[in-house]
């Protein structure tokens, strides 16, 4: 998919972002608000895309009355693919035999607009639906202003420069915030307080300061939640840390514990005292957990345990175990 949609209007070339990372703060917050309205049944996926185009171009959708003009906007909007994935029945069973490129295309482009895909007509007859694709690596809301305070509260940072990922989030801060990633709107001030805390991060102080963030507008608080969830999804689907989410649900495994309990485990293993570990970078923390998981699998294999037994002991899928070995 193209990251930008370019078109010519009255001799000038314009560009519309077609990726989360291409949005600015205003565009991000407004799009998140539209997606929330869509989840409440107030907007369709098509109208969300149309509003995105109008927003970027500075057009007032309520003032567009010409049918041809609206048709042209709708044509542009159909090319906007980044906010959604398309889900087909039975966990995308119809896409099972497609190559990787065709699969990705079918997950983004409605079947009625697919070209060069032999099963597009069949797909168009299926009961497919759009779901929000919240997976990206960018901090859109660098700071939050609270009424009555002179200085804004600075949030966590995300940097992907020079093909390297870094973040200011600490292990404890990430753990606390992740517990609230799907929180109700009433808990949004607490989530914001956690993510916009100064370092060194302290859980109790973040809790105490949460009342201050009740003064922040709801659109910003909701966008902050969406932003953090997008980063979580990115970490655990597009980086080396995705292995940490592969454990199959079931009884407790020898290498799977709660994130908070894992802090105590690392302290017992000599990585530092509890405070030192809780203040370490979340990426360092996840890296250690990943390393311990891989070492555990290899240790079990070295003890002559076969792959099936390792899978039963660790609750990791066999394909993941084979990749490790």
Enumerate the predicted regions with their spans:
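An amphipathic, hydrophobic-aromatic interaction surface with interspersed Lys/Arg
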Residues: 1-303, 315-324
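Short alpha-helical "recognition helix" segments of helix-turn-helix
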Residues: 309-312
């Amino acid at each position: 998919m193209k990251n930008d949609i370019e078109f010519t209007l009255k001799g000038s070339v314009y560009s519309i972002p077609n990726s989360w990372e291409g949005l600015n703060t205003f565009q991000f917050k407004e799009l998140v608000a539209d997606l929330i309205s869509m989840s409440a049944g107030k907007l369709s996926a098509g109208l969300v895309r149309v509003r995105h185009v109008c927003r970027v171009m500075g057009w007032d959708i309520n003032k567009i009355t010409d049918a041809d003009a609206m048709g042209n906007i709708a044509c542009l909007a159909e090319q906007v693919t980044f906010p959604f994935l398309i889900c087909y029945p039975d966990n995308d069973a119809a896409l099972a035999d497609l190559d990787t490129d065709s699969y990705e295309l079918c997950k983004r482009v409605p079947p009625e607009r697919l070209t060069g895909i032999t099963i597009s007509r069949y797909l168009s007859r299926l009961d497919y639906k759009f779901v929000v694709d919240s997976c990206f690596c960018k901090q859109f809301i660098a700071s939050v202003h609270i009424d009555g305070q002179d200085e804004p509260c600075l949030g966590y940072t995300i940097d992907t420069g020079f093909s390297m990922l870094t973040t200011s989030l600490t292990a404890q801060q990430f753990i606390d915030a992740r517990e609230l990633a799907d929180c109700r709107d009433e808990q949004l001030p607490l989530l914001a307080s956690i993510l916009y805390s100064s370092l060194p991060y302290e859980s109790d102080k973040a809790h105490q300061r949460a009342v201050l963030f009740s003064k922040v507008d709801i659109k910003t608080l909701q966008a902050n939640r969406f932003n953090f969830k997008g980063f979580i999804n990115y970490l655990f689907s597009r980086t080396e840390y995705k292995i940490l989410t592969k454990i199959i649900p079931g009884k407790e495994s020898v290498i799977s514990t709660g994130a908070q309990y894992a802090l105590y485990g690392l302290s017992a293993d000599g990585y530092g005292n509890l405070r030192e570990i809780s203040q370490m970078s979340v990426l360092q923390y996840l890296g250690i957990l990943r390393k311990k998981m891989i070492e555990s699998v290899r240790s079990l294999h070295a003890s002559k345990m076969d792959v099936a037994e390792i899978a039963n002991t660790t609750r990791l899928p066999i394909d993941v175990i084979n990749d490790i070995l």
